[in-house]
Amino acid sequence: MARLNITPLYSSLDNWPGRLFEAEGATIFNARTATSFVFTYPPGHDFAGFRVAVTGTGFAYSLGLPSAGSISSVVVRNGAGQPVLVFNSFTPNTLASDLSQFAASVFGGRDALGNGPGANGRGAWSILLSGNDVINCTNGNDRRSVEGLNSGNDRFNMLAGDDSVAGGIGNDTIFGGSGVDEISFEETSHNLGDSAFRGISVNMATGRLIDCWGGTDTFFDIERIIGSRFNDVFVGNAGRNDFSGLRGNDVFNGGGDQDRVRYGDDYWQGGRQGIVVDLETSNIGGVIRGAIRDGFGNRDVVINIERVNGTRYNDVFVGSSERNVFIGAEGRDSFNGMGSRDAISFDVSYTGVAQTGIIVNLQLAANQIVNDGFGNVETAISIEDIWASDQNDRLIMNGADNFVFGRDGADTMTGGGGRDTFSWEDEDEFGSGDRITDFVAVGTANLDRLGFDVEAFDNMTSTLRLVNGTSATTAAGVGQFVFNPLNDTLFWDENGSALGGSTAIVVLTNVAALSAANFDLF
């Protein structure tokens, strides 16, 4: 076994971490003793200036490279001398502690004519993590997984942050910690595909997962699962589940709450077509079954799934009798929410293409999405809610009770008829020049509301503090909403009557005053 301590520098590496253990070229040797073997990567290497220090016992050398020895630690430092990876606690007389085999992968065996095996960084990783290992991550976002086969019954301590673990061989135990954490088997479409032989079967309620090699993994505090290139089975729990199936004819059973299936990664794994979604082909006893053709042309079964992320291509979304949320992104998509209350979200680009502001008019009979931010005209039928982009959007809603989330950018929003709610969920969304053209502040029939996620804003609580006037009246440091009728603008003043801290939220055209009935603090 070995213990691997990953530092925050690992997730910020610019190049494939397999190259951390590939030493082809004019490698600089800093130490070759019976207990220490140290080398530095030369200019031109992906990790030029990085130093690998191996310590242990019984080190011997042949032609300048290790031929024997038992490893006790391997430390990788960057050019500034800061540790990136620290391996230690190796079990003696195992593959992982064999210096000769590790060095053979790191340096390869090519002669002067280029004949023989080259360096194999993936193989070196596989040797170091060939036992029952403990991998300790950081309190940051550890999105970069370890490399190699990573065989053995391993324990992953992911700690805080939004983390990602690559599923590997063995009966592993994964502690996600706080944050949004995932287990991914997408590497079965690449390096790990040669040894994998089956799809995963995961149950979020029991925290058990049969992996692609037949091992049984146990997990805690994991929120998202990414499947394999085979036929996968996903079973959710009572909370919100987040699944990606990738290739294969997959089965998704969401369970309770609002559950999501994502297809945006299909493109990166070779999927070259849009998805076709029908979330409700039958409804028997409250069990809602549907079908989705994925980005590879495979047919997935969905049970009690409410949210779907599409692809970069032209997707077709048909909803269910439950509340649905769809994300289409780059392609020319079509949306039909069917029953209940349904939303389209516009904050995703699957290929990194820059998005412009969206233009939506739900009062049109057809082509309600005039511009999806990528230049496409799209159909949106039976859609009540819009979650807009981070650009300058123009949104005209219909006669339903709509929910509008403008996000960043200077958004111009028209609620239309109905009791509409306009929402802000991040401080960055303030001060961007938002405007609501028809906000209804009085009356009972179509009274509109302004929604705020109080945890996202300094000094805001679920207790409303509001004044209609030109400045805050609360004590210093006590935040307050200020609606100034002289310019029709609502401000948030996080400092109260103290100087500074006032930021414009939205202009409410022709509104004289606001009251508690106009606010939803959640």
Task: State the predicted function of each range.
Residues 6, 137, 146, 176, ...:
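Extracellular beta-strand solenoids
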Residues 8-131, 477-481, 493-494:
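Mature extracellular "passenger" or substrate-interacting domains of secreted, surface-exposed proteins
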Residues 165, 174, 183, 200-204, ...:
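Fold-core signature of tandem repeat domains
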Residues 125-130, 235, 253, 413-414, ...:
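N-terminal helix-cap/turn-to-beta initiation motif at the start of protein domains
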